[in-house]
Structures are given as structure tokens and as C-alpha cells.
């Protein structure tokens, strides 16, 4: 099993890139300032230098492809083509099976394909979105499986299966922990920062629904209460920049200014 601390470190810069891009959409959250623009450019350059040939897995550059495409920063010539070639090779080599039990592999690939404007339904002759139709297999992985399946369904809203969408939404809503937030651990009564932030991101298209709006509000309050005194977050006993990035993404999704909202200012220190 992959050490969770190592995984968080590997995803760190991709998370920063995505979070910085999200912040830039908020005029009151340092958007458009030279320092933010410089951070975007430096991180985008670092990611592409560190991962010159992005692979189709969570640690090999797939998150980089997603974050880079969404950031608005220009990719190097042929960068996305390399990703597609690597993805097609993996799909063909494995006869369309990215994983037997981790269906986030399919959701992440669909998100990456849609982010760079290619059709995930024909990659090496395989439809990468098809496995996500298997509700039982996806949710067997847990809450994160359903969250990323719903995110991938909503990535472009084209030909979305409304019945399947509702099944995932209903499943996710039922996983809320009292008094708010979400966790990967079904047996836990305590919510988790990362899973709560991820789940809030996938609930945004439904924010006008009264029940969902209340869940979102409770989730945001949980994230505010879980924030450390230095303005950051901890995971596995260590300070976690990835958790900070996930929270920034979640807040930005709802137009919440992470640098001005009083709930996220701890001793004059914010995200």
C-alpha cells in the first residue's frame, strides 16, 4: 500500500497549481496580482519540467494534466499529446481495464480527457467512462469513488445520464457525518478535511437545492472549525499543503474568498 504521506507529497504541486488557478477566479482573493500570476507560471513550469511525459496514473502526472489545463497556463508543445499517447498505450496494454477495484482510475482519466478536449469514449478503442455506469462497483471503493464519478459526469454536462447522476448524488448525501462534513471511513463519526473538501466540489451543481445547500453550509463550517491556529491543516499528524489546496478549491467553487472570509482567518492567518 502506498504511504499516504508520500502520495500527498507527489500530488503537492499539482494541487498548488489547481488551487492557484481557482483563487485567480476570485477578484477579492488576490486574483490578478503579480505574485499569483508568477506562482501560476512557476508551478506550471515546474510541473512540466518534473513530469516531461505525463502518465495516466495519480502519481505520474495525470493530476498535472488536469490542473494545467484548468489553470489557463500554456502547456508546452506536445505535452497533452504525450499524455494521450501514454493513456492509449496503457489502455491497450491492459485491454481497457485500468483497475479491477479502484474506479477512480476511470474517473480521473475521464476528467483529464475532458480537461484537454479529447473524447474519453474512444481511447484506444475503449470507452473510459463506461465502467462508471457500474454504480455498485464504483461505490464499493467508498465515498471517493462516488465523488469522482459524479465530478466526471459533470465535467462537461454532455449526454449525462440523469438516473445515474441521481444515484451517485443520493449515495453521497447519505454519507454526511454529524454535524457536517464527510469521511472515507464509513465507521468513523468524524469528518475528514480532504474528503469534505472534495465532496463539496462535486455538490456545486446542486447548490440551489435546499437539502444540498444545507449540506454545503455544514461542510464549510466543518472546514472552518478544522483549520489549525496557523491557518493551515494537518493530516496524518503532519502539516498538509494538499489539504489546504483542497479547501481552497472547495471554497473557490462557491465564490468564498479564502483570504477575507472571517471563518477562515485564524489569529490573522488565512489559507
Task: Label the model's feature ranges.
Residues 9-22:
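Sec-dependent N-terminal signal peptides
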Residues 2, 14-15, 30-34:
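N-terminal leader/targeting segments and the immediately adjacent pre-domain N-terminus
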Residues 35-54, 78-98, 120-140, 163-183, ...:
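Long, well-ordered core segments of solenoidal/helical folds
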Residues 25-28:
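C-terminal motif of bacterial Sec signal peptides marking the signal peptidase cleavage site
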Residues 30-33, 71-74, 82:
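Ser/Thr/Asn(+Pro)-rich, low-complexity disordered segments
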Residues 31-42, 59, 63:
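N-terminal amphipathic/basic helix or basic patch
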Residues 52-75, 97-119, 138-166, 177-215, ...:
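An alpha-helical repeat/solenoid feature that recognizes helix-turn-helix modules
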Residues 1-9:
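N-terminal secretory signal peptides that target proteins for export/translocation
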Amino acid at each position: 500500500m502506498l504511504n499516504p504521506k508520500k502520495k500527498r507529497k507527489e500530488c503537492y504541486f499539482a494541487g498548488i497549481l489547481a488551487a492557484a488557478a481557482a483563487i485567480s477566479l476570485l477578484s477579492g482573493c488576490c486574483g490578478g496580482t503579480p505574485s499569483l500570476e508568477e506562482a501560476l507560471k512557476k508551478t506550471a513550469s515546474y510541473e512540466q519540467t518534473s513530469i516531461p511525459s505525463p502518465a495516466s496514473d495519480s502519481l505520474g502526472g495525470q493530476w498535472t494534466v488536469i490542473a494545467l489545463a484548468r489553470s489557463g497556463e500554456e502547456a508546452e508543445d506536445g505535452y497533452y499529446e504525450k499524455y494521450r499517447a501514454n493513456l492509449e498505450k496503457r489502455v491497450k496494454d491492459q485491454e481497457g481495464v485500468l483497475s479491477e477495484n479502484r474506479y477512480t482510475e476511470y474517473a480521473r482519466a475521464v476528467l483529464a480527457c475532458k480537461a484537454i478536449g479529447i473524447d474519453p469514449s474512444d481511447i484506444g478503442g475503449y470507452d473510459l467512462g463506461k465502467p462508471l455506469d457500474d454504480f455498485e462497483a464504483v461505490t464499493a471503493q467508498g465515498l471517493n469513488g462516488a465523488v469522482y464519478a459524479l465530478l466526471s459526469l459533470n465535467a462537461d454536462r454532455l449526454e449525462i445520464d440523469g438516473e445515474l447522476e441521481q444515484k451517485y448524488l443520493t449515495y453521497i448525501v447519505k454519507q454526511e457525518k454529524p454535524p457536517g462534513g464527510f469521511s472515507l471511513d464509513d465507521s468513523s463519526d468524524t469528518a475528514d478535511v480532504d474528503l469534505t473538501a472534495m465532496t463539496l466540489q462535486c455538490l456545486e451543481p446542486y447548490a440551489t437545492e435546499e437539502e444540498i445547500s444545507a449540506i454545503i453550509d455544514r461542510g464549510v463550517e466543518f472546514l472552518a472549525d478544522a483549520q489549525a491556529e496557523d491557518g493551515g491543516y494537518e493530516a496524518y499528524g503532519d502539516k498538509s499543503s494538499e489539504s489546504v489546496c483542497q479547501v481552497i478549491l472547495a471554497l473557490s467553487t462557491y465564490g468564498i474568498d479564502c483570504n477575507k472570509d472571517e471563518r477562515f482567518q485564524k489569529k490573522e492567518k488565512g489559507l
